[in-house]
């Protein structure tokens, strides 16, 4: 019998976040996120106040499905052009880690 669940989580995971686009519908974009343990997540949340949107995203992301290359400059362009992007991405990250919306 194949085991599908492991106690050791993968170092990264992928999830889609809906990026708000002014004047239109939100667009789902797939991101690759860093995994954090429960204790690491608690510490990250405690120290998140005052962190810039760019720094927050650099702290949780390792990649994305966009045709633009992933990096600090591209993240800066993202948060400058789409003000709701950072909150949407961080919310999705936290949601995935705590499994808030898992259901039937």
Question: For each of these PLM feature ranges, what is it?
Answer:
Residues 45-104:
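Acidic, low-complexity intrinsically disordered segments
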Residues 1-46:
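Short, charged/polar N-terminal "headpieces" of proteins
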């Amino acid at each position: 019998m194949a085991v599908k669940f492991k106690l050791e989580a993968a170092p990264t995971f992928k999830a889609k976040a809906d990026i708000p686009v002014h004047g239109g519908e939100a667009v789902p974009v797939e991101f690759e996120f860093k995994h954090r343990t429960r204790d690491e997540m608690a510490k990250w949340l405690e120290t998140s106040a005052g962190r810039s949107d760019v720094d927050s995203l650099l702290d949780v992301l390792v990649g994305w499905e966009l045709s633009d290359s992933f990096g600090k400059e591209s993240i800066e362009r993202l948060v400058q052009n789409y003000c709701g992007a950072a909150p949407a991405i961080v919310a999705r990250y936290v949601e995935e880690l705590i499994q808030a919306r898992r259901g039937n």
